[in-house]
């Protein structure tokens, strides 16, 4: 007999322990112990009380005759001979096994144990029949978990060694469903199943490019096997460990080949695998070097929305690299992306909209891409999406706008399209990535005087300032950077700052932050606010000098640049110059001149010029060896750097002359 009764289940278990070669150690550990060793295997094995209640309700409903007929067939499989088993399996397939009640019929009578047991037999027809049933019923999450508990994964993986294509196809189809359980994904990897599945998708390019109705029966079998393998790999790619194993098994060139297929049912799962893998840096590079970008772009114009979603999301994840962004433009990928976001029928498809807007955002980082997007009136289409209810979509939209408005023409376009009020209203959101992009975009808009007038009318400066209270450091940093042009370009900016209760206290308080980006942005904001003498007096009362002095030992060039600018702005009030010298800030600031960044040189020279107003500071600078650096800066093409360096040298020289005159006077006396 092919099937077993409950009395022989112990023998079957012992037989598996002795004969399973795919996973020799899988019986040496308790499942819970295995799960604890790998983060990919954490799975809630028990259903909630609510789930159990709904199962009971489903069973308690009027039970159809098919339920009992299916259970009779399972009994025949258990007790029948080989022929009866095959016939019963074929009859079982005639029922709709995708319905829950029919799935219950199999599991309630112990049919899952029987089906898994059949996978061990040597009769290929029985195995094929069992796999066909399993591939249908494993759409049910509880059945998937049961298959894993019955140690079915190693048996299915072993079948991938078969020489029969249809058997391997059904095994891969079953794995595609069962591996939605995390523990199953680990078992496939540890049993060596990933290289076998990768082998399934190694197919001739001629088959991929030939329409299905023109393929021979053997080629059709190969195509179906490839599709099943692609589906299984798509499910397995939810694990980082599996993705790395897939890469080592040589999946990258095979993915590139499958993307050229004319068969949508093959392209969709492999595009999904590309999308999942593109979150890994090693895959991002491989996707570019294998020339996948043009093929991904070609599918963006497909009629299939799932394919467009997978493709646009893959570009979104890969376009962090400048080379990839250029390839997208050269392949004509920007046009279909804009076509997607302006299609009103896409608005309800959030995954597709999220992928397309994200891809546009990443591509807009490159200036050449922005020029193409301008020709497509992309800013107008993005503004139309600012009323979307999905935070992820809004994050991508505002991110794309923030990159586009780096150019003055797009600031005007955004203003004319009515985008500013919509962006300002979103400042009340609690989604940190969205707030970060809003701050970046409004910072660029504040550079435009006309846009700044609108922002003032909308009370945007107060809302941006309030973002400094946000617990996310990146939001704090970009908000502080956005404050700079707002203060610089606002009407009566000095009074505007003072009208915001607690505004300067909030800024100075952030100098205690541990985040370099926040500190740098806050220093830039202080340098701007301190341009007004009244505001500078308030900052001085808030002990800003002491907090700045605590930061001078930094080695970060961005912080050095903005810190030096803040020191330059604050030094010229009261006795701040002398106090900064007393706090031993001069020598560390002189070391900033060793930086390779000319912007650091400029702000450092400006700070040193202000500090050199105090004679003691001049002496310290001279002893620190600042003169050669200043002489070199005088030859710079940057006028501000030239003037600041010359001013500092003048102050040092004047002190030296006064000292020389004093010594001569003493000698004369």
UniProtKB/Swiss-Prot annotation:
Biological processes, Gene Ontology terms: sperm individualization
UniProt xrefs under SMART domains: ARM
Placement of ARM repeats on the sequence: 100-139, 141-180, 240-279, 281-320, 322-365, 367-406, 408-447, 492-531, 574-613, 615-654
Polar residues composition bias: residue spans: 1-10
Compositional bias ranges of the Acidic residues kind: 37-51
Keywords from the named record: Differentiation, Repeat, Spermatogenesis
Superkingdom of this protein's organism: Eukaryota
InterPro entries registered for this protein in UniProt: ARM-like, ARM-type_fold, Armadillo
Tissue distribution of the protein: Highly expressed in testis.
Keyword Repeat applies: yes
The keyword Repeat belongs to this UniProt entry's keyword annotation: yes
Phenotype seen when the gene is deleted: RNAi-mediated knockdown severely impairs male fertility. Morphology of the sperm individualization complex is highly abnormal. Seminal vesicles contain very few mature spermatozoa, which are often bundled together. Female fertility is not affected.
Region Disordered, annotated ranges: 1-53
General function of this protein: Important for spermatogenesis where it may have a role in sperm individualization.
PANTHER family: ARMADILLO REPEAT-CONTAINING PROTEIN 4 ARMC4 (PTHR46241), OUTER DYNEIN ARM-DOCKING COMPLEX SUBUNIT 2 (PTHR46241:SF1)
Other comments on record: Gudu is Chinese for 'alone without progeny' and refers to the male infertility phenotype.
Protein name: Armadillo repeat-containing protein gudu
Biological source species: Drosophila melanogaster (Fruit fly)
């Amino acid at each position: 007999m092919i099937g077993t009764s409950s009395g022989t289940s112990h023998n079957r278990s012992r037989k598996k322990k002795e004969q399973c070669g795919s996973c020799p150690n899988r019986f040496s550990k308790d499942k819970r112990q295995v799960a604890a060793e790998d983060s990919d295997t954490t799975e809630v094995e028990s259903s909630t009380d609510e789930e159990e209640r709904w199962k009971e309700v489903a069973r308690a409903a009027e039970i159809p005759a098919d339920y009992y007929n299916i259970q009779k067939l399972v009994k025949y499989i258990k007790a029948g001979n080989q022929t009866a088993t095959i016939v019963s399996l074929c009859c079982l397939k005639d029922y709709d096994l995708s319905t829950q009640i029919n799935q219950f019929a199999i599991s309630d009578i112990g049919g899952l144990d029987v089906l898994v047991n059949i996978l061990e037999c040597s009769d290929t027809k029985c195995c094929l029949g069992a796999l066909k049933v399993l591939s249908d019923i494993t759409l049910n999450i509880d059945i998937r978990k049961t298959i894993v508990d019955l140690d079915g994964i190693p048996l299915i993986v072993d079948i991938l060694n078969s020489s029969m294509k249809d058997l391997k196809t059904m095994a891969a189809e079953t794995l595609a469903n069962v591996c939605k359980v995390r523990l199953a994904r680990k078992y496939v990897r540890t049993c060596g199943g990933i290289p076998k599945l990768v082998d399934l998708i190694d197919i001739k390019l001629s088959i991929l490019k030939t329409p299905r109705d023109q393929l021979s029966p053997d080629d059709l079998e190969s195509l179906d096997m490839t599709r099943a393998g692609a589906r299984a790999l798509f499910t397995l790619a939810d694990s980082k460990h599996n993705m790395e194993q897939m890469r080592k098994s040589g999946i990258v060139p095979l993915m590139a080949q499958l993307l050229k297929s004319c068969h949508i049912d093959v392209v969709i799962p492999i595009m999904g695998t590309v999308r999942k893998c593109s979150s890994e840096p090693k895959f991002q590079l491989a996707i570019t070097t294998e020339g996948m970008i043009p093929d991904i772009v070609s599918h963006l114009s497909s009629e299939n929305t799932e394919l467009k979603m997978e493709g646009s999301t893959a570009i979104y994840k890969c376009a962090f690299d400048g080379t990839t962004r250029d390839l997208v433009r050269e392949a004509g990928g920007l046009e279909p992306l804009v076509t997607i976001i302006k299609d009103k029928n896409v608005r309800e498809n959030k995954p597709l909209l999220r992928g397309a807007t994200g891809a546009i955002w990443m591509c807009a980082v490159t200036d050449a891409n922005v020029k193409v997007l301008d020709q497509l009136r992309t800013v107008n289409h993005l503004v139309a999406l600012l009323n979307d209810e999905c935070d992820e979509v809004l994050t991508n939209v505002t991110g794309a706008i923030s990159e586009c408005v780096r150019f003055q023409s797009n600031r005007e376009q955004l203003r004319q399209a009515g985008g500013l009020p919509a962006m300002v209203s979103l400042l009340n959101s609690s989604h940190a990535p969205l707030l970060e992009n809003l701050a970046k975009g409004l910072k660029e808009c504040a550079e435009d005087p006309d846009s700044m007038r609108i922002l003032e009318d909308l009370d945007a400066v107060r809302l941006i300032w309030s973002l400094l209270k946000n617990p996310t450091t990146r939001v704090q940093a970009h908000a502080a950077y956005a404050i700079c042009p707002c203060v610089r370009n606002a009407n009566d900016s000095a009074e505007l700052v003072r009208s915001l209760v607690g505004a300067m206290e909030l800024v100075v308080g952030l100098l205690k932050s541990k985040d370099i980006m926040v500190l740098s942005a806050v220093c830039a904001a202080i340098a701007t606010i301190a341009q007004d003498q009244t505001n500078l007096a308030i900052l001085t009362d808030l002990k800003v000098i002491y907090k700045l002095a605590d930061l001078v030992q930094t080695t970060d060039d961005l912080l050095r640049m903005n810190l030096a600018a803040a020191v330059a702005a604050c030094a010229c009030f009261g006795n701040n110059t002398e106090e900064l010298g007393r706090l031993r800030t001069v020598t560390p600031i002189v070391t900033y001149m060793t930086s390779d960044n000319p912007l650091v040189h400029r702000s450092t020279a400006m700070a040193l010029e202000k500090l050199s107003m105090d004679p003691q500071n001049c002496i310290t600078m001279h002893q620190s060896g600042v003169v050669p650096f200043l002489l070199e800066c005088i030859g710079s093409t940057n006028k501000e750097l030239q003037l600041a360096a010359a001013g500092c040298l003048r102050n040092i020289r004047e002190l030296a002359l006064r000292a020389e005159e004093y010594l001569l006077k003493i000698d004369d006396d």
